[in-house]
């Protein structure tokens, strides 16, 4: 199991030990694992790096996603979703909400959090044709998909921030609120056992299947922006607090600091040696 992290130190990888992966992007902010490849973005300087190529990104890119060997970007400045081919040439662009800031890919569909337009938008791939839009409470900002069921974080009140965690079935349109939580929307992901991990405000929460009460509730975070779950490991990137952490989820244990410093996107990828990192070893930043 290998971990990728976009950081102020560049693109970092952990697979038994830390190493820096040479790239021309000095300060990457977003990444996406595309099979054995990693797409890397510097959203501040509007640069994309993949397979040895540097391309220009639209302004305001908030999300980078892979679909097959192609790439998706979502911009909160242009309010557009864009699909790129295997050589990073833009194929098609579609309007998607107002200040959109979250999306998820499910088979041949991409779900976009329309944010200020109050809708979850469903687009078909590869033509990016909008096939449905579901009005939801508040401003939907984060979404994760588990088959045909979406799990979403929506901001209800920016003045005294409250976030609604809910589920939505794509086939029936059924809406099911899970919890109303204090704080800003951070991140949400679905574990292999179909349970929910969510970062809201200064908290990390876990909701068992079909439960509206969290069985894990950890505090002390800044604002978790990226979550990635694989097997019994949860990878956490908290840019506000300036660290990346990893925790065991079965049973849940206290998160271990994996990296200290300015950080952005993170994800798991297959480790070439097929070995798990020794998390009891020294976890100093590289």
Question: Where do the protein language model's features map onto the residues?
Answer:
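Blade-level signature of beta-propeller repeat domains, shared across WD40, Kelch, NHL, RCC1
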Residues: 237-286
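A short beta-strand motif characteristic of beta-propeller blades
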Residues: 17-23, 52-57, 88-95, 129-134, ...
